[in-house]
């Protein structure tokens, strides 16, 4: 089995959410943060032949980079990673899945059953980068998502502890069910670059769906 560039990008992203990783048999991969406040699911091009538990995903990805165009051959307790010529080989042992933090299919199903949303908006990659740069410049960690009415949504970088702090705001296309505001910790926006359809629920959870790739995230809101 070969790993595509798209899948490598997703795996690198998942490594920032949680180093523990289990690739379940099939073509759906998932991850959840240790704090259970970031959950993600993605369909990939490859088909895993069996479950594969990885204790440190970032280390595993670094190992893959040791060979050009790595090819994976699964065994019961390890995977053999080789280059296309077969000259270079790495034997990498799996970790018992019981020792790893990973999401269950039920967690994904429950998150996917969100039916009612208070705010929905489009978040393009350029806007997200502006939000992150503003947070870094101002020294803030929170982003407020606010709908004034049924037409238009405002994202604001601010300090939750200081009402007189400097702020950055940007309008985005979207709508809400009347007036409402919700807060997301910007450090939890560990998502693959791209444009997203975002929905905010009053159940203290947000859903980020990538517009071009089959990947989505559920990110907890700040209470």
Where are these regions (language model features)?
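Long, charge-dense
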Residues: 95-115
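DNA polymerase processivity clamps
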Residues: 1-96, 114-223
